[in-house]
């Protein structure tokens, strides 16, 4: 039976502070349109079927609340999630500083140091308002041991690639757990996107 005959479901959780564009990224990926207004999310779930590296996948994407008062609810979603998109806004130093808190929360809930995750600096179309450099994002991702990219939900820059990369991370870690073989160093590569618009397209491994 071919790979395409199997429909594997991937549970992906979007995490980050309020107003960083988590919902905008998710809706751009699922529905291909940009939501401009900010309406704080409590919890929204979306599903999308797509082919990633010649293998059909069903993505179950959970968009979570960034506000502190929903921390307990967020932990429940983290417990059930397989992979995580950890989002900050390049226009907000505070949202970047909050990222480590969310990362530590996932570590505590999952009770392990390593889990499938991608670090995302969103709103890279707002270069003039940048408060967090691309290098800072790369360095933080390196300390987490995860891929990194900068995205724009508004201009649909590297949105699909980000979600695909989380699925690849889940697959990679599953294979490592199954085989416990080499687990060698993955090499850095760049997400290709013709519309750079000053955004960092690096994916650090």
Swiss-Prot record:
Its EC number is 3.6.5.2. SMART domains: RAB, RAS, RHO. InterPro entries: P-loop_NTPase (IPR027417), Small_GTP-bd (IPR005225), Small_GTPase (IPR001806), Small_GTPase_Ras-type (IPR020849). Keywords: Cell membrane, GTP-binding, Hydrolase, Lipoprotein, Membrane, Methylation, Nucleotide-binding, Prenylation. Residues 203-205 form a propeptide. Alternates between an inactive form bound to GDP and an active form bound to GTP. Activated by a guanine nucleotide-exchange factor (GEF) and inactivated by a GTPase-activating protein (GAP). Gene3D superfamilies: P-loop containing nucleotide triphosphate hydrolases (3.40.50.300). One of its GO terms (cellular component) is plasma membrane. A lipid is attached at residue 202 (S-farnesyl cysteine). SUPFAM superfamilies: P-loop containing nucleoside triphosphate hydrolases. Belongs to the small GTPase superfamily. Ras family. This is Ras-like protein 3. The gene is RAS3.
């Amino acid at each position: 039976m071919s790979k395409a005959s199997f429909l594997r479901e991937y549970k992906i959780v979007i995490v980050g502070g309020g107003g960083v564009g988590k919902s905008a990224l998710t809706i751009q990926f699922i529905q291909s349109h940009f939501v401009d207004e900010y309406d704080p999310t409590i919890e929204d779930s979306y599903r999308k079927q797509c082919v990633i590296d010649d293998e059909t996948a069903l993505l179950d994407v959970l968009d979570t609340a960034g506000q502190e008062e929903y921390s307990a609810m967020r932990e429940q979603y983290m417990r059930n999630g397989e992979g995580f998109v950890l989002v900050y806004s390049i226009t907000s130093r505070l949202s970047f500083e909050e990222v480590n808190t969310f990362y530590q929360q996932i570590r505590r809930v999952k009770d392990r140091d390593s889990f499938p995750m991608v670090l995302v600096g969103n709103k890279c179309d707002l270069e003039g308002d940048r408060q967090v450099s691309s290098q800072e994002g790369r360095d933080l991702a390196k300390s987490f041991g995860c891929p990194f990219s900068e995205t724009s939900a508004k201009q649909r820059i590297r949105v699909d690639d980000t979600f695909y990369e989380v699925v690849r991370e889940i697959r990679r870690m599953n294979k490592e757990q199954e085989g416990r073989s080499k687990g060698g160093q993955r090499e850095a590569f760049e997400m290709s996107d013709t519309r750079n618009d000053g955004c960092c397209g690096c994916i650090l491994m």
